[in-house]
C-alpha cells in the first residue's frame, strides 16, 4: 500500500527503519527470483547494517537442508572430492581381454616359455543400450487325420493393444523421465540416434498406459502411507495446459510420506503424490480423511484449518507437528539480507538443536525422547525467551519481527518433537521427495491435462518409493509391470509388488 507524503512518519529513525525494511524485502524478492536458496551462512560482522554482503567471511556457521539424513552441520569445512578409490564393484560382470606376447620363445635359447603368472588391471566399460525387435511366433499345428484338429498357443497379454512397445521398453521410458528426469522430447531424440523415429506423443501414451496398469498398486501405496501413525505432508505446483488460455493453469502436486529410519522404526520409507487442481483446506481434508495421528507439515494454513475442523467435529484426532527448518529459514533469510546479529543469534541457538538431533539419529524412540527432554528442551526454552525479548525491542514491520511472529505462532507444533521420539524435528523428509518432482517439472515444464497430472502422480510415487527402498527403479518397474500385465501376479497379490516387499527372484538382486 502506497503512502502519501503527509502520511509518512515524521521521526527520522522510524523512516530509516522503514527504508531498511523495504530494501530487505526487495532484496528478498530478488533472491527468490534469481538467487540460490541454500541456507549455508557465512560469518557476519554483528555491527554490519548494510545490505552489501560482499565482505562476508567464508567460514560457515549454519547448515542447509541437503544432508542425506536430514541433519544439519553447524560448521562445514572444505570437503575432499569423492573419488572411486580401490577396486571396481564386485557385482559388475567381467570379461577378459588376454594379451599374449608376440613370441613364446625364449630370447636367449629359443626354448619354449611356460606361464608363471599374470598381471591384471581393470577398467570400467559400458555397452550402450541396444534396441531390438521382439518377434513372437505362435506356430499352428493341424492333424493330418481329421479337419478340426488345428491348435495354436494363445497370444500373450500385451500392456497396450496394438502397441509396438514391450513392457521393458515402456518401463525404460517411464524410469528415464521420473527417476533420471529426461523429458520425452529428449528421449525421442535419443531413439532417433538409434535409427528409429518415436514421436514424444507416442511415448506419452505409453506412459499413460503404464500408469493405468499400476493404478491399483498406487492405491495400495497411498493406503499404506495413510494407515501409519505419522505422516509428512507438503505440496508443490504442477502447471498444466489450459486450452483457450495463453498460459498454463497452476495445479498442485501434494505429497505424503513416511520414513521411520531416523529411529529404526518398522515402517519402510515411501512417498505418494496426489494431483489436484486445488490447494485448499477442503482438498487437504479430502486426501487425509482416513488419516489420524501426527501430521508433520510446514506452516501452510490449510493444514491448520484441517486440524481445527477435526477438533470441532470430534472426528478422528489429528495432531500437527510443525517444521523447525521452516522457522529457521526465515531467520537465515534475515541474516543474509540485513546481517542482523539478533537473527544470527537465533540461528546459532537452533544449530544446537540440530547438533543434538545429529547425535541421536538412529537411536530408539525412547532414547531420542529422553535425550531431547534432557538436552533439547532447555535450548528451546532459551530460544523462546530470547524471541520474546527481541519481540518487544524491534519494529513490528521488520523482517526479523515477522520471523519471530511466525515462530511464536507455531510454537506448540514446533516443540512436538520434544515429547515423542518418533516425531522428527522438521519435515525435510517430504521436502527431499519434492526435489525429484522439481527436476522432472523443470525439464518437462507442464502436464497436458488432468489425466496427465494423475499419470505424473502415479508414476512419480512408485518410482520414488522404489528409490527410497534402495532398489534399481528400472529393475523393479520392468519386473512388476510384466508380472501385472501377464497376470502372473493377481490383484490379491499386489501387496507383494510394493517396493519394500518386492523380491527380484527373476531379474537378479536389487541395487
From Swiss-Prot:
Matching Pfam families: DDE_Tnp_IS66 (PF03050), DDE_Tnp_IS66_C (PF13817), LZ_Tnp_IS66 (PF13007), zf-IS66 (PF13005)
Keyword flag Nucleus: no
Residue ranges, annotated region (Disordered): 59-79
TM ranges: none
Keyword vocabulary terms for this entry: Plasmid
Similarity remark: Belongs to the transposase 25 family.
The name this protein goes by in its record: Uncharacterized protein y4jD
Record organism: Sinorhizobium fredii (strain NBRC 101917 / NGR234)
Amino acid at each position: 500500500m502506497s503512502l502519501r507524503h503527509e502520511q509518512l512518519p515524521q521521526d527520522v529513525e522510524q523512516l530509516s527503519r522503514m527504508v531498511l525494511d523495504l530494501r530487505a524485502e526487495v532484496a528478498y524478492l530478488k533472491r527468490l527470483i534469481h538467487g540460490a536458496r541454500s541456507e549455508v551462512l557465512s560469518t557476519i560482522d554483528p555491527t554490519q547494517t548494510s545490505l552489501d554482503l560482499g565482505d562476508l567471511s567464508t567460514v560457515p556457521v549454519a547448515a542447509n537442508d541437503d544432508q542425506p539424513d536430514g541433519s544439519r552441520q553447524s560448521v562445514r569445512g572444505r570437503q575432499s572430492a569423492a573419488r572411486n578409490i580401490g577396486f571396481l564393484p564386485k557385482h559388475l560382470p567381467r570379461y577378459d581381454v588376454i594379451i599374449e606376447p608376440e613370441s613364446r620363445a625364449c630370447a636367449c635359447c629359443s626354448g619354449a616359455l611356460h606361464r608363471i603368472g599374470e598381471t591384471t588391471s581393470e577398467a570400467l566399460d559400458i555397452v550402450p543400450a541396444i534396441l531390438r525387435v521382439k518377434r513372437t511366433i505362435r506356430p499352428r499345428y493341424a492333424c493330418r487325420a481329421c479337419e478340426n484338429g488345428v491348435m495354436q498357443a494363445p497370444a500373450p497379454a500385451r500392456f497396450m493393444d496394438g502397441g509396438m512397445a514391450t513392457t521393458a521398453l515402456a518401463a525404460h521410458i517411464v524410469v528415464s523421465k521420473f527417476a533420471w528426469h529426461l523429458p520425452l522430447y529428449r528421449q525421442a531424440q535419443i531413439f532417433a540416434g538409434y535409427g528409429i523415429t518415436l514421436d514424444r506423443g507416442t511415448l506419452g501414451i505409453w506412459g499413460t498406459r503404464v500408469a493405468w496398469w499400476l493404478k491399483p498398486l498406487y492405491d495400495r501405496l497411498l493406503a499404506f502411507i495413510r494407515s501409519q501413525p505419522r505422516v509428512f505432508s507438503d505440496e508443490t505446483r504442477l502447471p498444466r495446459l489450459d486450452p483457450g488460455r495463453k498460459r498454463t493453469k497452476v495445479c498442485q502436486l501434494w505429497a505424503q510420506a513416511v520414513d521411520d529410519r531416523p529411529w529404526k522404526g518398522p515402517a519402510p520409507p515411501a512417498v505418494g503424490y496426489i494431483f489436484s487442481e486445488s490447494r485448499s483446506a477442503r482438498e487437504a481434508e479430502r486426501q487425509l480423511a482416513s488419516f489420524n495421528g501426527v501430521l508433520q507439515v510446514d506452516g501452510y494454513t490449510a493444514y491448520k484449518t484441517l486440524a481445527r475442523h477435526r477438533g470441532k467435529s470430534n472426528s478422528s484426532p489429528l495432531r500437527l507437528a510443525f517444521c523447525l527448518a521452516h522457522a529457521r529459514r526465515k531467520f537465515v533469510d534475515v541474516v543474509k539480507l540485513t546481517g542482523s546479529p539478533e537473527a544470527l543469534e537465533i540461528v546459532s541457538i537452533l544449530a544446537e538443536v540440530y547438533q543434538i538431533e545429529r547425535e541421536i539419529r538412529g537411536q530408539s524412540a525412547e532414547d531420542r525422547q529422553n535425550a531431547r527432554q534432557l538436552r533439547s528442551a532447555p535450548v528451546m526454552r532459551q530460544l523462546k525467551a530470547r524471541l520474546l525479548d527481541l519481540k518487544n525491542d524491534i519494529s513490528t514491520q521488520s523482517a526479523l519481527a515477522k520471523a519471530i511472529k511466525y515462530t511464536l505462532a507455531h510454537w506448540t507444533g514446533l516443540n512436538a518433537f520434544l515429547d515423542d521420539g518418533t516425531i522428527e524435528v522438521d519435515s525435510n523428509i517430504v521436502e527431499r521427495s519434492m526435489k525429484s518432482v522439481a527436476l522432472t517439472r523443470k525439464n518437462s515444464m507442464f502436464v497436458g491435462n488432468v489425466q496427465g497430472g494423475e499419470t505424473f502422480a502415479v508414476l512419480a510415487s512408485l518410482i520414488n518409493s522404489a528409490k527410497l527402498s534402495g532398489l534399481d527403479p528400472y529393475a523393479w518397474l520392468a519386473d512388476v509391470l510384466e508380472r501385472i500385465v501377464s497376470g502372473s501376479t493377481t490383484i490379491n497379490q499386489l501387496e507383494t509388488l510394493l517396493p519394500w516387499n518386492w523380491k527380484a527372484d527373476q531379474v537378479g538382486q536389487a541395487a
